[in-house]
Amino acid sequence: MEIKLNNGITELEKIDLGTNLPTGEYEVKISLITDNSINYTTSINFNIFSIDNSTKRGSVAIIKEDKKITSFFGKHEIDYEIFSESTSIETPVIINSINTEVFNSKDGNVIEKIKSNQSDNFKDLMDNINDFVNKGGNAIYLQIPGKTRKRIGPNLTFLADGIDYLPQKPIKNFSQGLWDGILHINSKHKIFKNLPINVNMSGIYENIAPTISLRNFKGNNIVQTIAFDRIPDGNIMKRNYIGSGEVWSGADLSIVDHGKGKMLLSTLKLIENLNYDPVSEILLLNIIDYFK
């Protein structure tokens, strides 16, 4: 496609690529040409995804009504119920809401706020889900309750703060890089069917890439984090010249056993990107298929 540019600002027309492009990665290449001489060239990649809904998926349970996730279920014809004592052991339960919200502050600390609209019976609910899994059920944690590593000790040193709700007792840890990179790398697994594997979670994964990782437990890690503390122990008195703190590894997506069942623990931003980013939808569908 050739477009003639005039002096000043030229409004470019939209390029209609149609609706029948095959699934895959594409490159749009743009060149600025004057008198048959290329002055400048750039390019941008984009992906086309397709989701197969020809096979009926099994039903799921959630712990709270949420328009974003229920709209997703409706679009993909997935039956759902609110988790209760009568939920079948064959029905995976999705933990789509927890009793706190976690934010990253500019200084590398973690801010946690208790949701005012959450039930006071949250611990009882988590205990019921733990018992459900122990008997052979499966739980998909898209939100992780439990302790968070914060800089709240003497001289802002790190301490694990909060309540352990899960039997594995994972600890949430800030894992967002600034000038220093923090890698989140996925591995080959059915959950990443039809998606790139063994790569850093940038590019097509940039919307769902985590900023919180899990430590202090053992599981089958599908997305792994390699990071380090910018300040040794978080101690504000050690932030000069000494260098960085410990190097650590955490999990962003992991499957752990509990009794006769399994728990999937995820810090990926899947719920936030449903009905917006197809990668989040493909991953959640793959997760549901994995546990059916």
Identify what each model region corresponds to.
Residues 1-13, 21-31, 38-58, 158-160, ...:
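Extracellular ligand-binding/catalytic regions of CAZymes and related secreted enzymes
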Residues 89-91, 135-138, 261-262:
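Loop/turn elements at helix/coil->beta-strand transitions in domains of secreted/extracellular proteins
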